[in-house]
């Protein structure tokens, strides 16, 4: 009987230890649903070996905003004292405590330190282990899954556990709950109903104009067509310095749209004779991208960007960040990750908000059997001081954590002194028609306003659009763009985020708008209450745009023909070019770039031309009205170059 007593005691001890273990471990991730494309097969073989990657929690995420404000706020003693790329990477690398805590846990579970490597960017611990070991490590069961459409295989679990004491140090585990194949193209590209992926702005033109109209164009008829002369007159832009700084090239992003040198030369010959024929951007081609193309294949976006920017910045150079091979550029749901990978090598494997590296179910995967056969390009290009992006999506198009990880990267670029500007969109308070599962591009069955992405990220500068109304001159105030003209219908994008709260640098301006010009619509507070009580917008969300510039009736050569175009994609390279010009003047007097410009502009709105006429309709409403000060149609207003230059020359 005594042996049985000992056995009973031993079993009781095991049960007690098991209960204690369960009490001190927690579910770290759980898959809530599995796509019908994935078929669960047999449990993995216990002796199979796998590469295990544990994404470590990054340091300084909570203080990241304060770090950026410290170098971006004009009142800060550290204004414009930017970090190097290595300093930023080190600042956000996992802490020594995080690495040690996770490594100690692995050792306790039989994964000795000699088996574990830390990646170069310090963000991952990587080791080889058998199925039996990782099931024991994560207190779970792994199964093989087969994708019935693609034939791809993956191993995954439905949930996994980590010790409660270690959980705060772990962001993500692979293999884990995600069913992403290790390589290959997604079986189904998630598309908008009316657009194949990213919105290339504009999507309306160009509208043909008779050739004889070209000869009669001058600053007196800018209400009919906007030429470089009109832009200089509107924003009081003088000629550029004859000897620009060699390290101050303007960056322009393009994807799936390509310029033609013939179009640029035609534009220079007609409107900018001081720019030599053959002038072209510096190539920074990412993951198999190529440019230029024959004039018969020229894209309206790329031609527009360069034809607007060159007359402002020349003889400064322009760098073209042409992104992704032709196959992926026209067949991807994700946005911007491969571009950011190329600027920051650590971003390729960077973990934040439960996202580690690119998402192969959304982003391009390289090598690409149908295109670029090289490896994903990581950290191969240095970011320019200013980057202009005339592309965008809507917040509801991609997962929130995908967007938040990306937004953090824009913050990091700001810490390095990079100014990133985005077009605010061309659909007023809505998304493109068909987006958001509604014909009008709105949320909740076509009623709730649809904020844009990445515009809602508080660490970029959003540019809305204005126009010179018929009969007005360049010396009179512009108005918010609204063209209700059928196929060419267009309104300056603006609204409030469902992901990000109002940033501190913007809080006073937004509060003033609500106090003095309260929109006549019901609202909700917080994305979790989307549409509640008939609310049309999030009263607590980050507002956009931040600024504006002309974006209508823009003169352009495209496909060898002269016409007009427009969109906030025209406004953005204009504003970005002006910032690049200002940086050139700062460099000439021994100062540096200006980095994230929003805090300076919100504290000094008088350097912009306030826009007080117009609205940005959408979702069956008039949208938001312009107003004195900031508004969600034209932001703080359009540039006044002399005032902006003086402001930034006076700053450190």
Swiss-Prot record:
| Location in the cell | Secreted, Extracellular space
Q: Which GO terms describe its molecular function?
A: metal ion binding; serine-type endopeptidase activity; tripeptidyl-peptidase activity
The positions flagged as glycosylation sites are 112, 218, 247, 331, 445, 613
Q: Which domain of life is it from?
A: Eukaryota
Peptidase S53 domain location: 225-651
Q: How does activity depend on temperature?
A: Remains fully active after heating at 50 degrees Celsius and pH 4.0 for 10 minutes. Retains 65% of its activity after heating at 55 degrees Celsius for 10 minutes. The half-life value for loss of activity at 60 degrees Celsius and pH 4.0 is 3.5 minutes.
The positions annotated for binding Ca(2+) are 610-611, 629, 631
- Keyword Hydrolase in record: yes
Q: How is the cofactor bound?
A: Binds 1 Ca(2+) ion per subunit.
Query: What is the role of this chain?
Result: Serine endopeptidase which hydrolyzes a range of fluorogenic peptide substrates containing the basic residues arginine or lysine at the P1 position and prefers paired basic resides. Also hydrolyzes clupeine and salmine, activates plasminogen and converts trypsinogen to trypsin.
Q: Write down what this protein is called.
A: Aorsin
Organism annotation: Aspergillus oryzae (strain ATCC 42149 / RIB 40) (Yellow koji mold)
Gene name of the record? aorO
């Amino acid at each position: 009987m005594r042996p049985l007593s000992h056995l009973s005691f031993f079993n009781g001890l095991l049960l007690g230890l098991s209960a204690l273990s369960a009490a001190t471990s927690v579910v770290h991730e759980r898959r809530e649903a599995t796509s019908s494309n994935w078929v669960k097969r047999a449990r993995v073989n216990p002796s199979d070996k796998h590469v295990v990657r544990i994404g470590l929690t990054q340091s300084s995420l909570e203080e990241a905003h304060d770090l950026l404000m410290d170098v971006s706020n004009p009142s800060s003693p550290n204004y414009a004292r930017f970090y190097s790329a290595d300093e930023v990477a080190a600042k956000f690398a996992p802490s020594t405590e995080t690495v040690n805590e996770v490594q100690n846990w692995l050792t306790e579970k039989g994964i000795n330190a000699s088996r574990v490597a830390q990646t170069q960017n310090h963000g991952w611990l990587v080791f080889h282990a058998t199925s039996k070991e990782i099931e024991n490590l994560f207190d779970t069961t792994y199964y093989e899954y087969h994708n019935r459409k693609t034939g791809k295989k993956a191993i995954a679990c439905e949930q996994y556990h980590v010790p409660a004491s270690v959980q705060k140090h772990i962001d993500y585990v692979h293999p884990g709950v995600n069913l992403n194949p290790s390589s290959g193209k997604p079986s189904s590209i998630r598309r908008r109903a009316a657009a194949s992926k990213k919105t290339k702005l504009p999507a309306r033109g160009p509208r043909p104009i008779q050739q004889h109209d070209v000869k009669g164009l001058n600053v007196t008829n800018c209400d009919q067509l906007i030429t470089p002369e009109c832009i200089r007159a509107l924003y009081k832009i003088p000629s550029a310095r004859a000897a620009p700084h060699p390290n101050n090239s303007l960056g322009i992003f393009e994807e799936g749209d390509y310029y033609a040198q013939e179009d640029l030369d035609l534009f220079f010959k007609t409107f900018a004779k001081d720019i030599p024929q053959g002038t072209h951007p510096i190539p920074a081609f990412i993951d198999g991208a190529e440019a230029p193309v024959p004039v018969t294949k020229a894209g309206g976006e790329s031609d527009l960007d360069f034809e607007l920017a060159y007359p402002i910045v020349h003889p400064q150079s322009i760098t073209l960040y042409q992104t992704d091979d032709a196959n992926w550029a026209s067949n991807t749901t994700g946005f911007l990750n491969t571009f950011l990978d190329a600027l920051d090598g650590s971003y390729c494997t960077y973990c934040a908000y439960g996202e580690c590296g690119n998402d192969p179910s959304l982003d391009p995967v390289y090598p690409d059997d149908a295109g670029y056969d090289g490896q994903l390009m990581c950290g191969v290009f240095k970011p320019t001081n200013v980057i202009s992006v005339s592309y965008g999506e809507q917040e509801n198009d991609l997962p929130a954590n995908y967007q938040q990880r990306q937004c953090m990267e824009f913050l990091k670029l700001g810490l390095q002194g990079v100014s990133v500007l985005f077009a605010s969109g061309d659909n007023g308070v809505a998304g493109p028609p068909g987006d958001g599962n509604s014909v009008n591009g709105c949320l909740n069955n076509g009623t709730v306003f649809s904020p844009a992405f990445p515009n809602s990220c508080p660490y970029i500068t959003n540019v809305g659009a204005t126009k010179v109304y018929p009969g007005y001159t360049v010396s009179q105030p512009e108005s918010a763009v609204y063209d209700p003209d059928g196929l060419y219908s267009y309104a300056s994008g603006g609204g409030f985020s469902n992901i990000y709260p109002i940033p501190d640098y913007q809080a006073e301006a937004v509060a003033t708008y609500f106090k003095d010009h309260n929109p006549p619509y019901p609202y909700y507070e917080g994305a979790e209450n989307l549409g509640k009580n008939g609310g049309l917008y999030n009263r607590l969300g980050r507002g956009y745009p931040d600024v504006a510039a002309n974006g209508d009736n823009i003169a352009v050569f495209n496909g060898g023909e002269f016409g007009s175009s427009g969109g906030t994609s025209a406004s953005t390279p204009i504003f970005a070019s002006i910032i690049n010009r200002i940086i050139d003047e700062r460099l000439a007097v021994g100062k540096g770039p200006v980095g994230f410009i929003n805090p300076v502009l919100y504290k000094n709105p008088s350097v912009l031309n306030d826009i007080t006429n117009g609205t940005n309709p959408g979702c069956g409403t008039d949208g938001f009205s312009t107003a004195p000060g900031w508004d969600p149609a034209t932001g703080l207003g359009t540039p006044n170059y002399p005032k902006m230059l003086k402001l930034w020359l006076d700053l450190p």
